[in-house]
Every structure is written in structure tokens, then in C-alpha cells.
Regions:
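Membrane-embedded hydrophobic alpha-helical segments
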Residues: 1-28
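Interfacial alpha-helical end/capping and short helix-turn segments at domain and membrane boundaries
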Residues: 41, 45-206
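Juxtamembrane membrane-water interface segments immediately C-terminal to a transmembrane helix
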Residues: 23-45
Length: 206
């Protein structure tokens, strides 16, 4: 009887240790996933805030101006690679909601495409438009009207900068919308997985 009791006690202790260890592993995994979800939201919110600031300070005043292509100044180069979402850490969401991951990927592609559009326009503005203006000023060229100005700037410079400016407006509006959608979708999924945890999300700021 004594041996049986000892065996049962040992077995009970082993089972307790097993379940405790499994609890610790699960608890550690949950903490990692919660931190990843919160960090991802932080990146989405930060990207959104950057675009809102850029739009307010730079784009909004030129939105309905047909001369925005030449009047809107160039921006300083932007990267924000430090705000890039790490999708490797979000792999666990595949079994939860693959659609959410797709929304996140679309939002990320849109954000960095917007930055690329801003940088591309600014580079062309600095490398081609500004030198052309400088040359015309050196030659004391006068402009009769807006149409004359476009003609003397040159068709290639005008068309390229006009299209690049239009792309900037399109990208910033689309990216703001997609980041908002991705953030709200991720927030809903995060609360579904961890209902007792708190998660941030993008709030309207336009």
C-alpha cells in the first residue's frame, strides 16, 4: 500500500509539473502574441498619424488647385522603415483570420507606395522643375499667363510633375483609408482572441 501511495504521489507530482509547465508555455506564448498585436497597432497608428500630418501640412491646401503640380513644394525624403510591420511575428493570425492579414498587407503596401510617390515627386521637382525655373529666370523669361508658363516650362516637365502630383493625392487618401480599415479589423480580432486585454486602434483624425 505504501508503495502504491508513493507511486500515486509521484504520478500526481509529475502531472502537476507537466500542466504547470504547459501553462507557463501557453502564458508566455499569449504574452508574446499580445505584445505583437499591440506593437502592430502602434505601427499602424504611427503610419496613419504621419500621413494625417503630411496631408494637413502639405497636401490639403493644394487638393483642388489646378496649379498644385508647380505650386506645391517638394518634401524632404521620407522612409519610416522603423515603422514597418513584421509579418513573421503575425503568422499565428493565419489560423485565426487570414483575411485580417491580407488587410494588413494591403495597408502596408499602400503606406509605403504613398511614401514612394511623395519621394518620387519631390525628387523630380528638385532635379528637373527647379532647375528649369532657375534657367528661365536667368534668361529673364516672362510669362504672359498660366498657359504660357506651362508651355515654357516644357511639356515633359509639366506632364510628369502633374501626374506625380495627382498620384500623391490618390495615394495619401487611399492609404489613410486602408490603414484605418486594417487597424479596426485587427482591433476586433485582437479583442476576439484576448477579450480581457486592452488594444489601441486608429481613431478618425481627418
Amino acid at each position: 500500500v505504501s508503495d502504491a501511495v508513493t507511486l500515486l504521489a509521484a504520478l500526481g507530482g509529475s502531472l502537476s509539473a507537466f500542466y504547470f509547465q504547459r501553462y507557463q508555455v501557453q502564458d508566455s506564448q499569449d504574452k508574446t502574441q499580445i505584445d505583437t498585436l499591440r506593437q502592430t497597432q502602434f505601427f499602424l497608428i504611427s503610419q496613419y498619424d504621419r500621413l494625417i500630418d503630411i496631408n494637413r501640412q502639405h497636401f490639403a491646401q493644394w487638393k483642388d488647385d489646378e496649379q498644385a503640380w508647380c505650386s506645391m513644394p517638394a518634401l524632404l525624403p521620407m522612409s519610416y522603415k522603423e515603422l514597418q510591420v513584421d509579418f513573421g511575428k503575425l503568422f499565428f493570425l493565419l489560423n485565426k483570420n487570414a483575411e485580417n492579414l491580407l488587410l494588413l498587407q494591403i495597408a502596408q503596401q499602400s503606406f509605403f507606395a504613398a511614401l514612394e510617390a511623395f519621394n518620387g515627386r519631390s525628387e523630380f521637382h528638385i532635379s528637373h522643375f527647379q532647375p528649369r525655373i532657375g534657367l528661365l529666370e536667368e534668361q529673364n523669361v516672362e510669362f504672359k499667363d498660366y498657359e504660357d508658363f506651362k508651355t515654357k516650362i516644357g511639356k515633359r516637365v509639366f506632364k510628369t510633375l502633374e501626374m506625380a502630383t495627382s498620384d500623391c493625392f490618390m495615394h495619401i487618401e487611399g492609404s489613410i483609408r486602408k490603414l484605418r480599415e486594417a487597424s479596426r479589423s485587427l482591433h476586433a480580432l485582437s479583442k476576439e482572441i484576448y477579450p480581457n486585454e486592452k488594444f489601441s486602434l486608429i481613431k478618425d483624425a481627418e
